[in-house]
Amino acid sequence: MIWYRRNAAVTTIVDGAASSATAAGSMAGNVAETVVSGAGTVASSVLQPLGFDPLRWLQGGTDADEIDDAERLWVAVDGMGGDHAPGPILEGCLDAIDRLPLKIRFVGEIDRVMAAATSLGLREALESARAAGHLDLVASGPSIGMDDEATAVRRKRDASINVAMDLVKKGEAEAVYSAGNSGAVMASAIFRLGRLKGIDRPAIGALFPTKDPGKPVLVLDVGANMDCKPTYLHQFALLGNIYSRDVLQVKRPRIGLLNIGEEECKGNDLSLKTHELLRDESRLHFAGNCEGRDVLSGDFDVVVCDGFTGNVLLKFLESVGSVLLGVLRAELPRGRRGKVGSAFLRSNLKRIKKRLDHAEHGGALLLGVNGISVIGHGSSKALSVVSALRIAHSAASHGVMEDLATLQQGCD
């Protein structure tokens, strides 16, 4: 299953960079090889009881009757973005309104949205949310398809993702969410919201579970930038440090550089030069190189890498949950003994699935633009939408943008 679809055109739009990923591909192969051992450690740890888990906390919810309307934040939603939009996106938004202190500005083609609401039996819930002032429908033009080039954001100025970004720019929403074409989402965010001063390239940051239930790791970049300079990775570390500190409540995030060895002398030219920058950065707690097997170890709070390597890692980890469950089921004895064993393990298996299922984590933040932007999976269903909206709400309510603004000091 593909989490983030990226058009190569977005790199051309933003910086005119040429694509040359040969060295990154070699490094990605080493990373994928070593991360397998880390996955085994996670497999054994997920059977342990859960303590405080930011991922679990992000996945939780609140009864609608307990939510004070004064606490609700406006989030703009690209209702036409995604493989299955607008139906599952609308369903997830209505569910999120009942569970989270937020209000939705749902952007899309009104006729298609209303038709989807009717076909899914959501018409009454939709009208109720509108009457309560918890959901607004905002009209847009034709959407940008999942297979369109990122340049479409310039041709289709009234596309749903552009309209949603404009709501954030005008202060009518505090965050934006889209499960659409990630290249187009990134391009729209850059053109509409602009980059933070001092940040050359925005990065997509995704949360991965680790063997410690209370310590997810933020990995960035996982697909926005195929070719990186050392300064880009240095900036990714600064962005990730603030997110980890503000949203995940890590007092002193441990920053790791994804590499093929722990020693300072290991890696390609990008790794060696980035290591020097991170080592000398006083604003960071640089914990050194992070091998692939250590990404899920819980020893790092933030791991930085180029988008090519990060996306390879991301796609590999997508398969871990289903593979582990398949292995466990295959190893259970058949017959009566197997049924008894399955009964005892049922709750554990459900917990494993929940912790490793990408749908439970919803989406990833696009860090480095002048606004909170969350990119969801192209295949997002209602559960993924709720989880992604929770991430957007958490980032907005924890003052992430205020702290990110401090990175701009001295950049005028």
Q: What feature does the model see in each segment?
A:
Residues 6-47:
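Composition-driven recognition of long, low-complexity, acid-poor segments enriched in small hydrophobic
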Residues 124-173:
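Phosphate/nucleotide-donor binding subsite
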Residues 28, 167-186, 266, 271-353:
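Glycine-rich phosphate-binding loop
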Residues 28, 49-115:
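N-terminal phosphate-binding or glycine-rich loops at protein starts, especially the Walker A/P-loop
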Residues 74-87, 224-234, 375-382:
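Short, glycine-rich nucleotide/cofactor-binding loops
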Residues 86-88, 100-105, 226-292, 301, ...:
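Glycine-rich phosphate/diphosphate-binding loop of Rossmann-like nucleotide-binding domains
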Residues 190-219, 299-303, 307-412:
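Glycine-rich phosphate/nucleotide-binding loop
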